[in-house]
Amino acid sequence: MQTVLFLAALVSLAAAGYPQYHYDVETRKLDPSLLNIQTKVLSLLENWKQVNPDDEYYKIGKEYNVEANMESYTNREVVTEFLSLYKAGFIPKNEVFSIFYENQALEVIALYRLFYYAKDFETFYKTAAFARVWLNEGQFVYAFYLAVIHRADTRGIVLPAPYEIWPEYFMNSDVLSKIYRIQMQKGLIIPEQGPYYGILSKDNAYYFYANYSGPLTYEDNENLLSYFIEDIGWNSYYYYFHNRFPFWENGEQLIGPLKERRGEIYYYVYQKILARYYLERLANGLGEIPRFNWLDKYQTSYYPLLSSYQLPFAQRNDDYYLASGDNINDIQFIDTYEKTFLQLLQKGQFKAYKQEVDLYNSKSINFVGNYWQSNADLYEKVPKRNYWRSYEATARRVLGAAPRSSINYENMNIPTALDFYQTSLRDPAFYQLYAKILDYINEYKEYLEPYSQDVLHYVGVKINDVKVDKLVTYFEYFDWNATNAVYLSEQQLDTVSPSYIVRQPRLNNKPFTVNIDIKSDVESEVVVKIFLGPKYDGNGLPISLEDNWINFIELDWFTHKLTSGQNKIARKSEEFFFFKDDSVSLFKIYELLSNGQVPSYMVDRYIYLPRRLILPRGTQRGFPLQLFVVVYPYQAPVKEWESMRQYIVDNKPFGYPFDRPVTLPYYFNQPNMYFKDVYVYQEGEQYPYYNSYWSQNQVSNH
């Protein structure tokens, strides 16, 4: 009987109806001058929770003295600030680190700036080795990852995917405990039992089959979305966004002249996240994103099965009363912040922090976005600001529902999903919070003049037809390396240790082509945009464009030269501007490096969404959506933005023409615009849970 169980488990794990993901890696030749830098960067991130006395970095970092090398940094002030904090005592090793914990954040920002202002890579490497040996592990990785992205001499360097660096933040604790068990036992004591527990062994690697969270974590059918909100690519996207635009750093340093659009970027990214999430809700029959009031009981519980390498994550009960206990002062601050914004809108003017802003101007979206993020550019003309007394940070703290620590380090902080950019998207409260923020920003947009027919109409250009291939989604298995979750023995550090691989089904879609038939009276260079939005709301009723403009997600943005007469454009989903392939594993990176190559999209397109998440999961009968295609004259980006062409195609606002409310829907029936009804079909299992009782008989309203 036991043998039958083992065989049944093996069959269900190895098959389960899902294909296996295969990489098709687009590579580029790595500049020979960067090869040594690339190798050293990767070496500092391997097994980062522990130090290896036999590694090069340890011997360098153990002896390096920052104070004795002050001349090796281009900004003496940041060295002085770092040393002041370092001598006072940084957070100890093995403590949970979050950028939302104030004292820890002040320290890690000082460390990042020390890295950033190292005069050359040799100094940067020595400083990083010092931090790797002596400082808190989480602070080191956070600051180092950021510095590699933003330093000029490390541009072109590939970094491992976030889920390979922090595996414990991307899988549930049941899988983590199995990995710990195998590491402690030094393998499977009875190999035949492995498949029964969801563990397979092959070629010095252990494969752990992982499920997504169920009703124990999410109530009210929210668990139907766990395959999406717990997707490692979805959560990595948000982490990359923070690394490209950390709220506490000045925009001039991060994005140069694009700083004047930082607040606009903030709005655009969160609109895209919420629009994509909303489509997935509709596909699962869950309806609208719930709204909440800070003074009422919060109804959305969350019981994460996550654990840091030291502490389990805090849980939030249903009927959680937000405005109670330690939250009273925070709720008052939040309430005042919201009311202040509405009062500013009524006045039409903001005058503070040594700046004056006309809130009825479309370019003021930059200020409005900065206001809600409370980032460094909002306060650039005034002395240093406490970013942890911001709306975002305070709201996360309240919704996280963690017990408050009375002592900064000794008592530690109980982590919540909202404390980390790697895990925030797993908590349904995240989407409800940012839906609230976007509601306020859209209040500002209501004061802007809607686009007129003259602005939207492109005279002489007509889209005759749009045809789309059959849209199909499915689940497939994907392997990712979780070895960084464990501590290796001294012997394993110096040998080829076993790899611990998590195997998990993920949403994907079949490649498709959008065929656009355009008639033009003249030869011209144009911009083509493709959007995807809902056809019906959560009740199965058609949505008017007045209510629906905010729900469209921009899929593609490209230029094209039209000739006089008929033009046919075939745009493949693999070409879509805002999407990329999944990150390859660290093993694959090393394999490519041996030939002097790196994955090109992990260098300059890491910030985009995985291509397999273009479409929401379909249904067997077809999930109805609408594609919107628009063509308009090309205006080149201003010269100052040339260095940011991987983010910008033309000179229009991000999300145009859905960057403003639609008050007259018939204005969007111009000849150069086209709405196309499409359906998304799901092949195979509707939910990635093998024989899951909890996901049976759940269908959308469409």
Curated annotation (Swiss-Prot):
PROSITE patterns reported for this sequence: HEMOCYANIN_1, HEMOCYANIN_2
Tissues where the protein occurs: Hemolymph.
Signal peptide start-end: 1-16
Main location: secreted
Keyword line: Glycoprotein, Secreted, Signal, Storage protein
A cellular component annotation (GO) from this entry: extracellular region
Protein's cellular compartments: Secreted
Highest taxon of source: Eukaryota
Keyword Nucleotidyltransferase set for record: no
SUPFAM superfamilies: Di-copper centre-containing domain (SSF48056), E set domains (SSF81296), Hemocyanin, N-terminal domain (SSF48050)
Entry-listed glycosylation sites: 211, 481
Gene3D superfamilies, per the entry: Di-copper center containing domain from catechol oxidase (1.10.1280.10), Hemocyanin, C-terminal domain (2.60.40.1520), Hemocyanin, N-terminal domain (1.20.1370.10)
Any one GO molecular-function label of the UniProt entry: nutrient reservoir activity
Family: Belongs to the hemocyanin family.
Job of this protein: Larval storage protein (LSP) which may serve as a store of amino acids for synthesis of adult proteins. Binds the A.niger cell wall component alpha-1,3-glucan, a fungal pathogen-associated molecular pattern (PAMP) that activates the host immune response.
Name of the protein in question: Arylphorin
Native species: Galleria mellonella (Greater wax moth)
Gene: LOC113516268
